[in-house]
From Swiss-Prot:
The lineage of its organism: Bacteria, Pseudomonadati, Pseudomonadota, Gammaproteobacteria, Alteromonadales. The keyword Electron transport does not apply. GO terms for cellular component: cytoplasm. It comes from the Bacteria. It comes from Pseudoalteromonas translucida (strain TAC 125). Disulfide bonds: none annotated. The gene is mnmC. This is tRNA 5-methylaminomethyl-2-thiouridine biosynthesis bifunctional protein MnmC.
Length: 669
């Protein structure tokens, strides 16, 4: 579990870490120190003008008060303003990406107090405070100023965090801020293994700067691959260290068989129309990448995203699995994104009323007890509640204990999809083509061509298929192992008793608080059928399921008539995880990774061939509202040679090639 820093303030008002007996920044002028030591000595201003990519990546060991980050953001904002004034918009860096590692994060109350000392940073500080993560280990992606600044804030040990990262072979970091506490007081932040790990994720030519001039630090960084030198330190300090990476670590482990160095995205075709495609378009728009949406329906969100109320909460297990890691961080990112959309004026009906997962059967009681015993998840993310506590939360009497997701709730999916599409269009206008069923994809020397009813579209540098159950409809993707699951949600009239319900209830299905005088009740699960016809039998099944668990409750027995329903086919896979990544023909993998049949130890022997520009983004099932936003960021970050918000193990768990790889390892193909 992540533990907050234990601090006090000295006579100058500077925060001091009690566990390390060291100050977070200079008593004299912390802001000036930050600028001189890190920003100026890494020559950031000049490099922002001449960098060969649209994004610049800085990594910091020791986030602390966030002062270095906020100060850098302020100067980067000034850089963008100068570009605008000078109309130099066709070159120079457009997005700042900041990676920071923090083992003992400050509490949000301590951070708020500390940052009041820097009123000139207020606009950025307020954004940081409003998004500041809960104490969950791993990468928290925070976004500032319409996505022009991205902070990947890792909670946990720096070395262990770097080991989890997914990155291309050429590296991702352009500059390092080494700002842990003094080496004599916090030696873990200045160990050789950390320096070597830094090199693994750095580009050749990456620079570093640090306040210390300790000899063992200079020698360690030199041994790792940096050319080091001493320069004048800040204020009264005699010297400090700077360095440049001349070569990468030859002994580094190769990234996984899913990683490639890619050409940046330029013009992308997105096939879909629901939550998944709206997330992709939004991620592309934040980067100013040209795109076009192709939707077979007359309007967005006409398929599986067409429900009136969709529950938003993470699906967590009693173990630190890739599944749990994905959904925990995806949920927190989705909440931040939805809050930002609302703050920006893009409205959609919703209620963050919490989600109460009831233990309606003994196996669920046992599962919830196991969740509590493992203590993997912060109480602010989920907590176990007794029957009495649960009934108080829900506002109705059920008699069930359960797990409560306080930050969960429900949103209106069609409205959310349209809000995201509108927000994307405001950031970077894109084309939309509706009533357009794409029948064929063809790769040419100039890019991808799309065909529909005798019309040709393109060429496009990349195609991202977000078509749900129809994602396997193309010659290139017919081998996708999609599991289609039909589901029907019923809309039932609220009663005086049922309107007392204050939170979403989950049992075998789900039941929402009243909205427009109705509750959403469902959903059915039926495999091997593609019918979208609403049936009375499924309405009866939804009511029977509710009464089976809540037949003793007034809110359930007093409900009115079912007046409407929605039916759709969810797209999923047998491991209940989505797909986000490049789609490669099975024959290519069979050739490139034949050694996988000899055992897992051969999994890093080769990389598959250069990406062809066809990508899959589907399989979210009933959890797209939770997981699609962060998975979208991960996919577009990967395709744009940016830092990725999901770990290497999660990247592999959701990659389209995972089933091929598993079958090779098991010698099934």
């Amino acid at each position: 579990m992540i533990k907050n820093a234990n601090i006090h303030f000295n006579h100058q008002g500077t925060p001091v870490a009690n566990d390390f007996d060291d100050i977070y920044y200079s008593d004299d002028n912390g802001l000036a120190e930050s600028y001189y030591v890190f920003y100026q000595q890494n020559n950031i201003d000049t490099r922002l003008q001449s960098h060969d990519q649209a994004h610049f990546v800085i990594a910091e060991t020791g986030f602390g008060t966030g002062l270095n980050f906020l100060n850098t953001c302020q100067h980067f904002t000034d850089h963008l303003a100068r570009q605008q004034v000078q109309k130099q918009l066709n070159y120079g860096v457009k997005r700042l990406h900041f990676i920071a590692f923090e083992k003992h994060p400050l509490s949000v109350s301590d951070l708020s107090k500390i940052l009041t000392a820097w009123p000139e940073l207020n606009l950025l500080s307020e954004q940081l405070i409003s998004q500041y993560p809960i104490n969950l280990a791993g990468c928290h992606r925070l976004e500032f100023n319409n996505g022009t600044i991205v902070l990947d804030l890792y909670f946990g040990d720096a070395l262990e965090s770097i080991k989890t990262m997914s990155y291309p072979r050429s590296g991702i970091v352009d500059a390092w801020f080494l700002d842990g506490f003094a080496p004599s007081k916090n030696p873990d932040m200045w160990q050789q293994s950390l320096f070597n790990a830094m090199v693994n994720i750095s580009k050749v030519g990456a620079t570093l700067a640090t306040f210390t001039a300790a000899g063992f630090v200079r020698r360690g960084l030199s041994d790792a691959g940096f050319t080091m030198q001493k320069v004048k330190g800040f204020a009264h300090k005699r010297s400090m260290l700077i360095g440049t990476l001349k070569h990468t670590n030859d002994t580094q482990s190769a990234p996984s068989y899913f990683n490639h160095d890619v050409s940046p995205l330029s013009n992308v075709a997105v096939i879909g129309g629901g939550i998944a495609s709206s997330c992709i378009l939004y991620s592309l728009a934040k980067r100013g990448i040209s795109s076009q949406l192709f939707c077979q329906d007359a309007a967005p969100a006409m398929g599986a995203s067409h429900n009136v109320q969709g529950a938003v909460y993470p699906h967590l297990q009693a173990k630190n699995s890739p599944h749990s890691e994905l959904f925990a961080h995806s949920f927190l990112y989705a909440k931040r994104l939805y809050k930002q959309l609302l703050n920006d004026g893009f409205s959609f009906d919703h209620s963050w009323c919490g989600v109460l997962q009831h233990a309606v059967k003994q196996p669920l009681v046992d599962r919830h007890e196991n969740l509590a015993q493992q203590q993997l998840w912060p109480q602010t993310l989920m907590r176990n509640v007794t029957a009495e506590q649960g009934d108080t939360i829900a506002g109705v009497t059920t008699g069930y204990s359960g797990v409560y997701f306080e930050q969960g709730g429900w949103v209106n999916p069609p409205q959310l999809v349209n809000a995201m599409l509108s927000a994307a269009h405001c950031l970077s206008p894109y084309k939309s083509t509706f009533n357009c069923h794409i029948e064929q994809l063809k790769k040419t020397s100039n890019g991808w061509l799309l065909f529909s009813n005798g019309k040709q579209f393109g060429p496009f540098s990349d195609v991202i298929i977000c078509a749900g159950e129809h994602s396997d409809a193309f010659a290139q993707t017919k081998a996708l192992p999609i599991v289609g699951v039909r589901g029907q949600v019923s809309h039932v009239q609220a009663s005086e008793q049922s309107t007392k319900l204050k939170t979403v209830l989950c049992h075998k299905g789900y039941f929402t608080p009243a909205y427009l005088d109705h509750h959403c009740m469902g959903a059915t699960f039926e495999k091997n059928t593609k019918s979208r016809q609403v049936t009375e039998q499924d309405n009866l099944s939804n009511r029977e399921q509710l009464l089976n668990f809540y037949g003793h409750c007034n809110f359930a027995t007093s409900l009115g008539n079912i007046t409407a329903a929605k039916a759709a086919v969810r797209c999923s896979f047998i491991d209940h995880l989505p797909m986000a990544g490049e789609w490669v023909e099975q024959s290519d993998y069979l050739t490139a990774f034949a050694n996988l049949r000899l055992g897992k130890r051969y999994q890093y022997q080769a990389l598959s061939k250069k990406q062809q520009g066809l990508h899959i983004f589907t399989g979210f099932g009933a959890r797209a509202l939770c997981s699609a936003p962060l998975c979208s960021e991960h996919l577009i970050s990967s395709l744009n040679n940016e830092p990725r918000p999901l770990s290497e193990r999660v990247s592999q768990a959701i990659h389209p090639a995972r089933f091929i790889v598993r079958d090779l390892i098991r010698n099934k193909i």
